[in-house]
């Protein structure tokens, strides 16, 4: 019996395509094609997005760049904007009473994610495109319905401990109002904080399975931080500083440069991003338990991790860059 042949890819390297990211379709470019275990996968670059968002995707997420699919892209965008207006796809909120940074980020979650792609986001601005109300959702094929159904049922809430909320507000105030900058490289960077947490959990005599899970969660937090920092975790005033860091340390992961305040900002935003993961509700609940445990660790060690003395007044020449 002749061996089964590998499937033939539908798309070629360099081809312009449309690709699902979450519930929406985005213009993208097929950079590489690979066949593994009889499955075709494509390395995708989303047009206009930071290269950190490049990823391998299965063929089921990729569509031809033709008029019919462009129309489908527009219909999905309108349908999801309607859902956002109804509050059905809201991301995480840190608590009922919010002020300063927390309130700002809640607004970003509900408005910004579908108005601006992650590649050109900014921690200090949002933009909206008003759409007329739709009485009836556009008819789409079953694949698209599956994407929408998945998104509708996921609501990820990451709760920030009360002890940490004042640090979020202070961080926001120091940078946006007092025009100070967090001193970089951080005295204790994100990698070091995560390593200390993993060692702390290990010292408590966890089983091998739990130790493995902690290591996976720590690695995941680090990856999310490095991907999201430049696009979603910075205030406008910090961007020139970030550009300088990239120029001075082009090959360094940002988790080796930034510290606790920026790591804490991640948890205000990460709930909205977790809605895009393919995890079922049980797996998400388990992941949230680990994330909340890490936040408790940050709260317990907040006196050593967070300090206003870690910020410095920006010099006059920096202000000119930040305008």
UniProtKB/Swiss-Prot annotation:
Please list where the region (Sufficient for interaction with PHF12) is annotated. Answer: 149-303
Interaction with RB1-2: annotated span = 284-305
Q: Which is a Gene Ontology cellular component entry for this protein?
A: nucleosome
Q: Which GO terms describe its molecular function?
A: chromatin binding
Domain Tudor-knot intervals: 12-62
One GO biological process term is:
positive regulation of double-strand break repair via homologous recombination
For the region Interaction with RB1-1, give the residue spans: 125-191
Q: Where in the cell is it found?
A: Nucleus
What is the protein's major site of localization? nucleus
Q: What does this protein do?
A: Component of the NuA4 histone acetyltransferase (HAT) complex which is involved in transcriptional activation of select genes principally by acetylation of nucleosomal histones H4 and H2A. This modification may both alter nucleosome - DNA interactions and promote interaction of the modified histones with other proteins which positively regulate transcription.
Task: From the Swiss-Prot or TrEMBL record, give the protein name.
Answer: Mortality factor 4-like protein 1
Q: Provide the species name.
A: Rattus norvegicus (Rat)
